[in-house]
A protein has these predicted regions:
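Active-site histidine-anchored catalytic micro-motif
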Residues: 1-138
């Protein structure tokens, strides 16, 4: 069995963003040479997320509104975590959107369902963060 590891780095200038990272993950898969196996894509920071969904701007807008209703940034005084930083809402948003995804690799390609894409979700931007891509298989 082969194993491949790569870190993707992001520095998002805005507080929140959704970035389609499918092409970057596909490039990792091609570089790995693995034809059959699994890909793990994992946000390596507690205020960022990796998830699978549709790449549709209206849906991304809906995610943003929904997350802000569930865990609003303001007022920052509502959170006990906000001592030194004002990012408690980002931790909660990450919990909702998830930490990682696993995708099957079949015949050298990501084995997605219809419309599925991999996204990096940023909830406390303006600092450098990484995503781990780990691929195992043959």
């Amino acid at each position: 069995m082969k194993s491949y590891r790569k870190e993707l780095w992001f520095e998002v200038p805005d507080r929140r963003a959704f970035i389609n990272i499918t092409p970057k993950v596909e490039a990792c898969l091609k570089e790995s040479g693995i034809q059959e196996g699994l890909v793990l894509v994992n946000a390596m920071h507690i205020t960022a997320s990796v998830f699978i969904n549709d790449d549709e701007s209206g849906l991304h807008h809906d995610f943003d509104l929904w997350l802000e209703k569930l865990a609003p940034h303001q007022p920052v005084s509502q959170y006990r975590h906000n001592v030194g930083e004002d990012n408690a809402d980002a931790h909660l948003k990450r919990q909702l959107m998830g930490r990682e995804v696993v995708v099957a690799v079949t015949e050298g390609k990501l084995d997605f369902g219809p419309w599925e894409q991999i996204f990096y979700g940023e909830f406390d931007g303006r600092r450098r963060k990484r995503v781990l891509v780990k691929i195992i298989g043959e």
